[in-house]
């Protein structure tokens, strides 16, 4: 995997990021009632492998003017579904840039892209922090010949770590306005904002982290 021709490992690691956005809206009504509906979605593929983003947004609005304008009703609902997968990490251990900057330009990273993992032998141990675990004979471990804290194969990080965050959000608003006499109104408002947030973080134990100091 050593080469006499200098390689641009950063350029070869990253992909072309792409982002797509689509929207559609419909509205209509009369003097006393109007309706509005819209849908929008965004999908994106990041510059790093397996990094994706998607977002869906539904919006509905309705208003009424009743009883010769003595009662006005307004209602809106907004639903948002959003999912992010494998957002690039900062720091050192799980940040592929850390290793890409450290590896020499005489290393052909295409080899480690095609061979980012290997099967553990009897001599292979895994260490997480200051704790050493039993040997993982026959299990996948990262193929990376250089030892060092936080120093990991960037292609192993892309293929063998997974994180996601899913967000479902519902926003409701309602207003009722009653005209009592000219210049005097009574108004009631309702609002609700509810969010469900789910996070997943998975990683293989052979990722090298900095040993904790006592």
Residue ranges with predicted function:
Residues 13-14, 21-43, 47, 57-65, ...:
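Predominantly transmembrane beta-strands of Gram-negative outer membrane beta-barrel pores used
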Residues 10-11, 45, 94-97, 181:
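Generic secondary-structure boundary/loop-capping signal
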Residues 1-4, 47-48, 61-169, 187-214:
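Surface-exposed loop/interface segments of Gram-negative outer-membrane beta-barrel transport/assembly proteins
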Residues 15-31, 39-40, 154-201:
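Outer-membrane beta-barrel transmembrane strands
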Residues 7-17:
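Periplasmic N-terminal accessory/gating domains of Gram-negative outer-membrane beta-barrel systems
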